Swiss-Prot record:
Name of encoding gene: lolD
Entry superkingdom: Bacteria
GO BP annotations listed: lipoprotein localization to membrane
Signal peptide: none
One Pfam family named in its UniProt record: ABC_tran
Subcellular location: Cell membrane
The keyword Transport is assigned to this record: yes
Family recorded in the similarity comment: Belongs to the ABC transporter superfamily. Lipoprotein translocase (TC 3.A.1.125) family.
Binding site for ATP: G43, D44, S45, G46, S47, G48, K49, S50
Protein name in UniProt: Lipoprotein-releasing system ATP-binding protein LolD
CDD domains listed in its UniProt record: ABC_MJ0796_LolCDE_FtsE
Protein's job: Part of the ABC transporter complex LolCDE involved in the translocation of lipoproteins, in an ATP-dependent manner.
NCBIfam families: LolD_lipo_ex (TIGR02211)
Length: 229
């Protein structure tokens, strides 16, 4: 890891209003993510882990505070500029795979590269190589409904890496994987981390996985704490 800060959030708070009552989900969060750093986020269900991922990745706006990527304030960008920044620099692995049902596994994985104006041939070549990495060589032409839940999640992992992102945001990436596939995910994560210097921010309940990352942070009562596992 080097000391280049990729993403930084400063004094970030997120609140919601329900029945005229203000609920504080995240309270004055400060965090820096460095180039090639791997971070796990743990905490109880409903503690705000996924909310933090959405804020950091520009999918949602903080109520107060500032989030910057390479010094550029994300929530001040136009919708189109923010989408461009996300597609070019961020990869996403959601708790639910969000694969498009009418497209093949190969086409799903290639989609972000096609949105990024890669040629169809180049995008599919990249997708094919990643699908080999995650053990889905024999599933490339299948529709998502024709493969298992674990295989769909592996396809989603491959999709997150296709644009060679600077940061991958992962929300319970091993939640639908068996032990063998979880180990393969970690090996792939480390391989990409070492070779591409990709940073990973991983929300997980998998303590074994959390222990293997550079550091672990815990959200508790809306605050972010460093956790020693």
């Amino acid at each position: 890891m080097n000391n280049m800060v990729l993403l930084k959030c400063k004094n970030v708070t997120k609140t919601y209003k329900t029945n005229k009552k203000k609920i504080i989900i995240l309270n004055n969060i400060n965090l820096s993510i460095y180039n090639s750093e791997t971070i796990s986020i743990i905490g109880d269900s409903g503690s705000g882990k996924s909310t933090l991922l959405y804020l950091l990745s520009g999918l949602d706006n903080p109520t107060t505070g500032k989030i910057t990527f390479k010094g550029k304030e994300i929530n001040k960008l136009s919708s189109s500029d923010r989408s461009y920044l996300r597609n070019k620099n961020f990869g996403f692995i959601y708790q639910f795979h969000h694969l498009l049902t009418d497209f093949s596994v190969l086409e799903n994985v290639a989609m972000p590269a096609l949105i990024g104006n890669f040629s169809v041939k180049h995008a599919k070549n990249l997708a094919y190589k990643l699908l080999l990495e995650v053990g889905l060589k024999n599933r490339i032409n299948h529709k998502p409904s024709e493969i298992s839940g674990g295989e769909r999640q592996r396809a989603a992992i491959a999709r997150s890496l296709i644009n060679n992102p600077k940061i991958v945001f992962a929300d319970e990436p091993t939640g639908n994987l068996d032990n063998t596939s979880s180990k393969k995910f970690f090996c792939l994560l480390k391989k990409v981390n070492v070779e591409k210097k990709t940073a990973f921010l991983v929300v997980t309940h998998n303590i074994k996985l959390a222990k293997k990352l550079d550091k672990t942070l815990e959200i508790k009562n809306g605050k972010l704490y460093k956790k020693n596992l």
